[in-house]
């Protein structure tokens, strides 16, 4: 949760993101500094996590910066942030140490022990009328939802002991050397440990350990061995009967195949004989038809010869008759000419006789 201005107005939260803010604290754990230092701290907090400057001890005389890698590790993933409700850092630390929660909604700042103030990273307190600073302090309380993830039962641990993935004491010493208080360093390391444990829980939901893999592999191999034994037993008992039945069926199939082949050969021979008989019969019919055609041709030729003979005879008869008629006409013609000439001469003689008479 960030503070955008000294007036204490709440800025919008980024979805799925949680920021861990470290406030400057003195060596003795008592409120100290001036109002200008408080305002400088507030402006640095409003700029983001990169501008955090924890105050170093007075003997050092310098200001150290938090490591960017450490700040990146302290920002949990959106999936972890959505899994648990948000809770302020002061409430979480007070519930861990056994302190009661302060009353909410008051304008004045509440006081606690120096150790708790140093662990929570409290701002310097003022007893005067500073409602803007008090409201900003109330707005700058840390939401540590990812630190309150309930520890689930893990299958990958043989005992309920806590498993660490890095040297926490060395990290605490490093943070103390860089200007953080002891309780602040312990809180940061505990937050890192819990974040790593939560991430490992998420990883182990989808994965298994080497031991579990070996156990599962041995179980699968034992099941495969049992299946092999069952297969051998079945091969000796049931597979022998199945093989005998298969052999019997093969013999029956072979016999049926032989019978079918014999029937096919018989049918082929019968069809061949039928084809040959039909072929010979067709050939005989063809020869008979050829003979009949030859006889018909000879008869037709004889009829044509007879017809030609009859025609020649009729032609000759017609010619003889025509010649006889011609001779008869010629003879009648001569007779007619003779008769006409005789009649004409007779008429002339009569006419000459009458003419002589008249004359």
Curated annotation (Swiss-Prot):
Membrane topology designation: Multi-pass membrane protein
Q: Which domain of life is it from?
A: Eukaryota
Q: Which GO terms describe its biological process?
A: calcium import into the mitochondrion; calcium ion import; mitochondrial calcium ion transmembrane transport; positive regulation of mitochondrial calcium ion concentration
Tissue expression remark: Ubiquitously expressed.
> What are the boundaries of the signal sequence?
none
Pfam families given in the database record: CCDC90-like
Going by the UniProt record, its keywords in alphabetical order are: Calcium, Calcium transport, Coiled coil, Ion transport, Membrane, Mitochondrion, Mitochondrion inner membrane, Transmembrane, Transmembrane helix, Transport
Compartments where found: Mitochondrion inner membrane
| InterPro entries in the record | CCDC90-like
Q: What is this protein's function per UniProt?
A: Key regulator of mitochondrial calcium uniporter (MCU) required for calcium entry into mitochondrion. Plays a direct role in uniporter-mediated calcium uptake via a direct interaction with MCU. Probably involved in the assembly of the membrane components of the uniporter complex (uniplex).
Q: What is this protein called?
A: Mitochondrial calcium uniporter regulator 1
């Amino acid at each position: 949760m960030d503070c955008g201005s000294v007036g204490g107005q709440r800025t919008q939260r980024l979805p799925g993101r949680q920021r861990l803010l470290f406030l400057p604290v003195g060596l003795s754990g008592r409120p100290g500094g001036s109002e200008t230092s408080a305002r400088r701290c507030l402006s640095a907090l409003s700029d983001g996590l990169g501008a955090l400057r924890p105050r170093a001890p007075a003997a050092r005389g310098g200001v150290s910066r938090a490591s960017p890698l450490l700040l990146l590790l302290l920002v949990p993933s959106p999936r972890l942030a959505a899994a648990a409700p948000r809770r302020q850092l002061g409430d979480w630390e007070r519930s861990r140490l056994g302190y009661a929660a302060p009353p909410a909604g008051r304008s004045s700042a509440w006081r606690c022990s120096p150790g708790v103030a140093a662990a929570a990273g409290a701002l310097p307190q003022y007893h005067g009328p500073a409602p803007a600073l008090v409201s900003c302090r109330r707005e700058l309380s840390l939401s540590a939802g990812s630190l309150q993830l309930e520890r689930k039962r893990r299958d990958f641990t043989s005992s309920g002991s806590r498993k660490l993935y890095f040297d926490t004491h060395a990290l605490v010493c490093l943070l103390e050397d860089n200007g953080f208080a002891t309780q602040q360093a312990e809180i940061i390391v505990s937050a890192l440990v819990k974040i790593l444990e939560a991430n490992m829980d998420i990883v182990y939901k989808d994965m298994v350990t080497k031991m579990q893999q070996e156990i599962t592999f041995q179980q699968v191999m034992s099941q495969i061995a049992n299946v092999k034994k069952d297969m051998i037993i079945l091969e000796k008992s049931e597979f022998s009967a199945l093989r005998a039945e298969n052999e019997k069926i093969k013999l029956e199939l072979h016999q049926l195949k032989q019978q079918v082949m014999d029937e096919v050969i018989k049918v082929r021979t019968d069809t061949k004989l039928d084809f040959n008989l039909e072929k010979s019969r067709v050939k005989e019919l063809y020869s008979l038809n050829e003979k009949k055609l030859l006889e018909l041709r000879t008869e037709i030729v004889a009829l044509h010869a007879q017809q030609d003979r009859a025609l020649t005879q009729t032609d000759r008869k017609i010619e003889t008759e025509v010649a006889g008629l011609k001779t008869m006409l010629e003879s009648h013609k001569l007779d007619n000419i003779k008769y006409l000439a005789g009649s004409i001469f007779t008429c002339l003689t009569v006419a000459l006789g009458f003419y002589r008479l008249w004359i």
